[in-house]
Each structure stands twice: as structure tokens, then as C-alpha cells.
UniProtKB/Swiss-Prot annotation:
Stretches in topological domain Extracellular: 1-28, 79-102, 158-199, 262-274
Lineage: Eukaryota, Metazoa, Chordata, Craniata, Vertebrata
Family: Belongs to the G-protein coupled receptor 1 family.
Intrachain S-S bonds: C100-C192
Cellular compartments per GO CC: membrane; plasma membrane
Gene from which this protein is expressed: Or5p70
Alphabetical list of Gene3D superfamilies matching this protein: Rhodopsin 7-helix transmembrane proteins
UniProt name for this protein: Olfactory receptor 5P70
Amino acid sequence: MAFLEDGNHTIVTEFILLGLTDDPVLRDILFTIILCIYLVTVSGNLSTILLIRVSSQLHHPMYFFLSHLASVDIGISSSVTPNMLANFLVKPNTISYIGCSIQFTSAVFLATVECFLLAAMAYDRFVAICNPLLYSTKMSREACIQLVVGSYIQGLLNASFFTLSFFSLIFCGPNRINHFYCDLAPLVELSCSDVTLAVVITSISAGFITLTTVFVIAISYSCIFITIMKMHSTESRYKAFSTCTSHLTAVTLFYGTTMFIYVMPKSSYSTDQNKVLSVFYMVVIPMLNPLIYSLRNNEIKGALKRYLGKKIFSYGNLFCKTHYNDTHQV
């Protein structure tokens, strides 16, 4: 049942997600593409986490943050992708009121955590390049744990503000969300109550998160670039800058898309364009992050080669021993 009668009002109990398209051919194509992206996202980020855990060479603060970033990327993608895939197969694709709030809250929580993790990683690079002698002190295990825990706490705080805003909205009319997941903008459009308070609270909260993390990242990289330019050796400059390129690429993709979706005036682009940007933000970027950090990072590539080399060597020894035993038994 999509509606309940509450006195003189009709209360929405479930929503219909319209998804990306109604074209049956395009739906099949998109289903295949997004399913492949999701599988690569989960496998790629899990591989990153496992590689960091098993490789002692990667037991450094930067990779500690990266392992948490990979976990968050799996969560972000998993919060919307399974439901999006179901939308391609089932019509209409409904989601309950509580289910919508859970999806909405989890997406906000994980995106906020990612913002602060990216800021923590920028600070880590700042200390490593600008204050290398103090690196072991400033980026101790305790400090790294505090930064990660702080990221999750900020995620919970921001998600709580968005959750309260969601439950302050009353839905008594149309229940068709013109999106592939429960996002704030289409929910506000469907609300039949005053949305001013909800919009103000979420705008202030999201604005604070964005400005704080962007400020930390901008200051960190400004100091990094100044330090790099002061280096006399070209090789030293290249080595220092190469340690930042992966993170800088990830930051540019994440914040560039975020700014376009949530900062640009809605009149400047259509709802369909917003959906495409949201797919890139929620589905594609979590897949790209492990590729960015692995392809542009010599330490990760080296650890992967060593790990695969050990596996191949152990399997080779096992095969030789088995073959040797079989030969002598004959």
C-alpha cells in the first residue's frame, strides 16, 4: 500500500523510483554496464584492502587511510547500485518510506566520511613532504586512528542532520521520485509540507563539511606545491609530486562532481543531467579510486607484484611436488 489515511491527510508509505530511463533496449545495456562496474568496484576495493593488510610494505598511514577509503567506496556503491539494478529489471521499482530514509542516510554518511578521509590523506601528504622529520610523530598510529574515527563521527553527525530533515518532511501527494535513489532534491520537490527548515539545516551542514574539508585540502596542497618548488633537484621534485598525483586526481573527481551536483544552480542543468552526474558520483568514482591509486602508485604495484609472485611460486612448488610424488609412486 503506497498511501495511508491520517485524518484529513494522505500519508505516503512507499515511493516509486523512476530510474534512469524507460527505453527497454537502453535499460538492458545500462544494466549490463552498471553490473560490471559494480563487480569491478567491489572486487577492486576489496583487493586494495586485502593487499594493504597482507603487505608489510604498505603498513603506512597513507595506506591505512586508503584501506578505509576503499571500504567507504564499497559502501557508497552498495547503498544505491543494487537498487538501481533492480530498477532495470522490475517495474515499478518501489521502496518503502523507511527503506528510502535508510538509503538516503547511508549515502550521506558514507559521502561525508569520504570527504574527511580525503582531507586526512591530504594532511598526511603535507606532513610527509613539508615536515618529513616530524612525520613519525605527527602521523603516529594513534593520530591516524583519531583521524579515521573523527571522519566516521563527522559522518554520523551530518547523517543525523539529514535524517532529521528527512523525517520533518510530509509526503501526502505524488510518490514518484524522478531519480534512481532517494536523494534530497527530488524528495523536497515531492513534500507537501514547508521544506524551508529542512533545506536550511542540510545546506548549512553540507556547506560546513564541504568548506572544512576543501579548506584543509587546499591549504595542504598549497604548502606542498610551495615546498616542491623550493626543491633544487628535479628528481626530488618529481618524486615528491608523484606521491600526490593519485590523491589529487581522486580529490578532483570527487569534489568536482559534488560541486556540480550540489552547488551549481539547478536551472543550469536538467534532471536527466543530474542523474548522469549522480551515477558518476555514486557508481563510477568508487570504481575508479582503486584503479587510480594502483596504476599511479609504485609501492602498490610493487606489493601486488610481490604478492602475486609469491602465490605463483607457491603454486609452482605445489605442482612440482605433486608431479614428483606421482612420478615416484608409479
